[in-house]
Structures are given as structure tokens and as C-alpha cells.
Amino acid sequence: MRYAAFLDRDGVINVDHGYVSSPEAFEFLPGAPEALGQLQAAGYLICIVSNQSGIGRGLYTETDLFALNQYIADCLMDMVGVRVAAFYHCPHHPTEARGAFLKQCECRKPSPGMILRAIREHNIDPARSILVGDKASDIDAGRAAGVGRLFRVTNEGGVAISGEGVECVAGLRDVPSCL
């Protein structure tokens, strides 16, 4: 079985400007591409798992998100030779979405659905994998999926509540040195 780095996107890989949905609004956090390169070199599959309720709220479309994902994948390949194994997203919200997107689902973090799907699709051993997130919902999803190591990003002085088995780091760039 393989192992993976499950990564939230906004606030972990890129600056969270709020509902980032286009290449023009996307800005890598310092050291994030290089850290992804180090994780890949250490054998981790790179899997991005991101709540994207902006789709359900009507702020942007899944087509917009797919274009942004391609942009991110292309940038990472060009910058540091990283191949993103998969992008997973949840477009739903339980109270603030429209139409079919308005629902309680199993994919929206803190539910582990996106991670469990990645585990199935890529034959991943969760116990040998890591999760990096900036919110409690990320950590809870990783824990529920049985991910072996959980990292909470504080983003330079932000408040990070660490629970049992959670390692706090200033940014994604610090994770490879913890492994």
C-alpha cells in the first residue's frame, strides 16, 4: 500500500483570500511548493482535499474550480516537479447553499468522505499517511479516516488548538522536517 499527504488547500497551500476560485486570486504560501516537493520525494502521494462551499453558494462553478486545480497542478509541476495525485472537493454546505448543494453530506470536512475516497481510489494506507490542515474540521476528518499523523498549520501566529495527536507547525514548509 502507498501513503499520502492529505492537504487542505486554502490556508495550507495558498493564502486564504476567501473563496479562491481563479488563478488570479491564487497565491502560494511561502515555502509551500518546496514542501510539497519534499513530501513527494519522501514517497508521499499528494492529495488535496478541500471544502468548496463557494460552489454551493453560487459564487463560482465546478468548472471554475477544475480550471483552478489544473492551474495549481501545472504550477507545481513547473516550479518543483510535483505531481498532484488527486484533487477532491466538497461543494455542499448544510445551511448556506443552493439547490442540490444544500445538504448534510459525508464529504464535507469534518466528515472523512473525501479522504476515505482517496484511500480507496489510490490504495493508500492511512496509518502511514499524514494530513495537513489549518482548521479543526481538517484535523477531525483526518482523525476519523485513521490518518497516522495530523498537522495543524498556524500561519505565523494564528491560533491553533492542538488536541491529542496533533502537531502544530507555523506553515506547510515546516512539515517535511517533522517526518
Regions found by a protein language model. Give the residues of each.
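Anionic group-transfer/hydrolysis microenvironments
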Residues: 10, 52, 111
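Active-site flanking residues adjacent to catalytic metal/cofactor-binding acidic residues
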Residues: 7-9, 50, 132-134
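Metal-dependent phosphoesterase signature
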Residues: 13-30, 55-64, 79-83, 98-106
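Substrate-recognition element of Asp-dependent hydrolases with the DxDx(T/V) motif
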Residues: 32, 36-69, 83-93, 142
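Short, flexible segments with low predicted structural confidence
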Residues: 10-11, 89-91, 114
